[in-house]
UniProtKB/Swiss-Prot annotation:
The active site is at D101 (proton donor/acceptor). It is an enzyme of class 3 (hydrolase). The keyword Hydrolase applies. Binds 2 Zn(2+) ions per subunit. GO terms for molecular function: hydrolase activity; metal ion binding. Disruption phenotype: Fails to produce asperthecin. Pathway: Secondary metabolite biosynthesis. This is Lactamase-like protein aptB. Lactamase-like protein; part of the gene cluster that mediates the biosynthesis of asperthecin, an anthraquinone pigment. Polyketide synthase (PKS) aptA catalyzes the formation of the aromatic polyketide from acetyl coenzyme A and seven malonyl coenzyme A molecules. Polyketide is subsequently hydrolyzed by the action of aptB into endocrocin-9-anthrone. Endocrocin-9-anthrone is then oxidized into endocrocin by aptC. Endocrocin is likely to decarboxylate spontaneously to form emodin which explains why there is no decarboxylase in the asperthecin biosynthesis cluster. One of its GO terms (biological process) is secondary metabolite biosynthetic process. It comes from Emericella nidulans (strain FGSC A4 / ATCC 38163 / CBS 112.46 / NRRL 194 / M139) (Aspergillus nidulans). Its EC number is 3.1.-.-. The lineage of its organism: Eukaryota, Fungi, Dikarya, Ascomycota, Pezizomycotina.
């Protein structure tokens, strides 16, 4: 199992705030197509872009709701208004994963309509929820969603293939803008390949605008992650060749970050550490690097000796 380094929320809030001015403004409620209504979660911010996208899917009176936002009071007001003005109901509530900005609206939703308490679905369900299995199908008039287990951003992460539109609800694996945070890089890369193999042109992300060319966006994501893996491996190879560090020429995570980015603040380093830690664990799982025992801060990583042919 990969060691998890705590995520530095404060730094990312500062780091990502610069891109807030570059992302498009999205209306609170948008009829994206005749089958998809997007309702923003009311939780806009540098980590969540324009806020969490929640989607009402279908064409009849009964709809599927994908995600529930963070639990902001504005979201339940907005979603209730849409339901009441259009005389529609929710048959299934599908949660892409456990993170609070996707599940936080569940209590308000149940308070609004207690009947929904038996209609909440999530992989690895919490108490009172129902499980989502890989390949499970949810149907309402005008919409057929098939669950696709795609761990990496989170272990329980689910995407949903929308058959009628040849589209994919991508959750947090692929965003409308920028890159997502990864919990397990090895699983994430496998999931990205799995998603790419679906060959779906359109993506409905959990954050950001609709993705009009999903295959191109996923190629960009995969290329970015692979570049970081190659970059870290090259640094460790250079360390061994130069005889830096000790023993096998290994480097600590701090030394790897220093080699990649130069002198940076502690906050920047804390923010970079989780993803780069995942890169190292992926390389270890691929048996390309090893590590010496020790605490996370003192652990030294090194290139494994290649066996002769």
């Amino acid at each position: 199992m990969a060691f998890r380094i705590p995520f530095a929320q404060d730094f990312w809030n500062e780091y990502l705030s610069g891109r807030e001015n570059t992302i498009p403004t999205l209306p609170v409620v948008t009829d994206i197509t005749e089958r998809v209504i997007r309702v923003l979660g009311g939780n806009a911010g540098p980590m969540r872009l324009q806020g969490t996208n929640t989607y009402l899917v279908g064409t009849g009176r009964s709809r599927i709701l994908v995600d529930t936002g963070q639990g902001m009071p504005s979201w339940i007001r907005d979603i209730a208004k849409v339901l009441e003005e259009r005389d529609i109901d929710i048959s299934y509530v599908l949660l892409t994963h456990w993170h609070g900005d996707h599940t936080g609206g569940v209590p308000d939703l149940i308070a609004y309509n207690p009947a929904l308490s038996s209609r909440i679905y999530k992989n690895r369900p919490d108490a009172g929820q129902k499980d989502i299995l890989d390949g499970q199908v949810f149907r309402v008039e005008g919409a057929t969603l098939r669950a696709v287990h795609t761990p990496g951003h989170a272990a329980d992460h689910m995407c949903f293939l929308f058959e009628e539109e040849n589209a994919l609800f991508t959750g947090d694996n692929v965003l409308g803008h920028g890159y997502s945070v990864v919990e397990d890089l090895g699983q994430y890369m496998n999931s990205m390949v799995q998603m790419a193999n679906l060959n779906l042109p359109l993506g409905y992300p959990a954050h950001g605008a609709v993705i009009d060319d999903l295959p191109d966006k996923m190629r960009e994501y995969i290329k970015h992650r692979e570049f970081r893996v190659q970059q870290v491996y090259a640094i460790l190879e250079e360390s061994r060749a130069a005889g830096q560090g000790r023993g096998r020429g290994g480097l600590t995570l701090h030394e790897i970050i220093l080699a990649m980015y130069g002198e940076i603040t502690d906050e920047v380093e804390k923010a970079l550490a989780p993803f780069l830690s995942q890169v190292l664990w992926k390389l270890a799982e691929d048996r390309k690097v090893g590590f010496e025992p020790g605490s996370a801060a003192k652990r030294r990583w090194y290139v494994r000796s290649r066996r002769p042919n």
